Swiss-Prot record:
The record marks 31, 82 as: Important for tRNA non-discrimination. It is an enzyme of class 6 (ligase). NCBIfam families: aspS_bact (TIGR00459), PRK00476.1 (NF001750). This is Aspartate--tRNA(Asp/Asn) ligase. The gene is aspS. It comes from Pseudomonas aeruginosa (strain ATCC 15692 / DSM 22644 / CIP 104116 / JCM 14847 / LMG 12228 / 1C / PRS 101 / PAO1). Homodimer. The keyword Heme does not apply. InterPro entries: Aa-tRNA-synt_II, aa-tRNA-synth_II, aa-tRNA-synth_II/BPL/LPL, Asp-tRNA-ligase_1, Asp-tRNA-ligase_1_N, Asp/Asn-tRNA-synth_IIb, AspRS_core, GAD-like_sf. Keywords: Aminoacyl-tRNA synthetase, ATP-binding, Cytoplasm, Ligase, Nucleotide-binding, Protein biosynthesis. The keyword Protein biosynthesis applies.
Amino acid sequence: MMRSHYCGQLNESLDGQEVTLCGWVHRRRDHGGVIFLDVRDREGLAQVVFDPDRAETFAKADRVRSEFVVKITGKVRLRPEGARNPNMASGSIEVLGYELEVLNQAETPPFPLDEYSDVGEETRLRYRFIDLRRPEMAAKLKLRARITSSIRRYLDDNGFLDVETPILGRPTPEGARDYLVPSRTYPGHFFALPQSPQLFKQLLMVAGFDRYYQIAKCFRDEDLRADRQPEFTQIDIETSFLDESDIIGITEKMVRQLFKEVLDVEFDEFPHMPFEEAMRRYGSDKPDLRIPLELVDVADQLKEVEFKVFSGPANDPKGRVAALRVPGAASMPRSQIDDYTKFVGIYGAKGLAYIKVNERAKGVEGLQSPIVKFIPEANLNVILDRVGAVDGDIVFFGADKAKIVCDALGALRIKVGHDLKLLTREWAPMWVVDFPMFEENDDGSLSALHHPFTSPKCTPAELEANPGAALSRAYDMVLNGTELGGGSIRIHDKSMQQAVFRVLGIDEAEQEEKFGFLLDALKYGAPPHGGLAFGLDRLVMLMTGASSIREVIAFPKTQSAGDVMTQAPGSVDGKALRELHIRLREQPKAE
């Protein structure tokens, strides 16, 4: 081995010992004829001192520059009092260097590694191999490794088997677009990269493996957001002969143990909340319980008002009128309210009504709002009492189709909570349960809210008679308003699976073409089974406090699903395309 210790491992117990370090020159300083090198490796920094007494080594140290790769041998010694650095793990010691070998030189990096805040993300991704040298980036990937190690250990200890499933599969309708891979040996046919190992893990349960897990790479060709990538990693889990409460218990214990082991954070038992309650109170199926603001329904008080913006949705069976009280925010300037009005417009809201509660004892005169003139005072008082409004509060209103109100006020609740620093705690884990089986599309057709293999809480006949009322045996783990993982009890009965397909408009021919292998497996003694998949990237993002999952993936794609470092995706030569039986169509030239 070239090194005896990592830089970050040096401490006072090594005082007087000889060590050999290998790494990069993080910083070079010349003070009063003495040269100081901060040497960096994966584990941290160490200060190495070179004095002129060793002329040859001193001359070498004088020639090194930032990011040179070096091997240094020297003796550990305690730093003098007053020269210790509490910000470094090895800040109480230094190494007196007496041998220095330059293993490789380096050009000046495109950006400084300790002053990176003004560097654009595209530049950082273009030189990701340099960006990852920054200690804060290395720390995130090291924590990611600890997280996966902890999870594997827990699942191994609880009887789960790590089984790999295929990357090349067949296209199936799972919601997002597939990444397609053309087949050379089957002209005109395509593999699909997996959006999840869903069907294969169910088949492993049919095969009798009982408890399965996999740290699985998954692919979805969809528009990217801050928490999405075209390729991402799932902690995929499936079990047989366990019900919802069993699976929830096993996976919750895993997450609680993970946070204790990695962050020394202890969680109480996670609360459970039905989907309907989450949407009603928080406007979201992944509520952030750290924010003490709730949506309150007030439609019953606004059905008879002449203000159509309120009375229309209040009398619409698919409409909703809800209020959101923000304590102590009546002094909010109009410019801020205008900004929030634009913000809710992103979610389809046509405006943002409000009432500032200045002095309730004065009745309407104590309220400041352009809408109070449209609402009878008795109804106003009921609304203000219902939301718990007191002097100094502001109450926002949303009135539209229920989905728009939930989306707009739910997002506003989060934004206001962060803007006004209303968060009451650092962590808020929970379970959301009792999801609907289906959601209605704009054209009136139905889509599976989770996926079409989720078991409903009813019989096949009841499902087909009233699919809109059917609840599923699904459950999502939510942390700080982010869905960490989603799962369900699966359908293990062929007739039930076919009933779900029929509700989704998948006829028998399409069932056989796309899911024949699954229906075939369900005929041969499929056990009751269920599972859950966690998004590893999101989990690491939350645990590290990163702003995006791109910060916790070694080599992520950009927002437009490209790789600026390798220039992927790239073009393919004509010979390769001919072997794949593919001919490219010329794109029309832009005028």
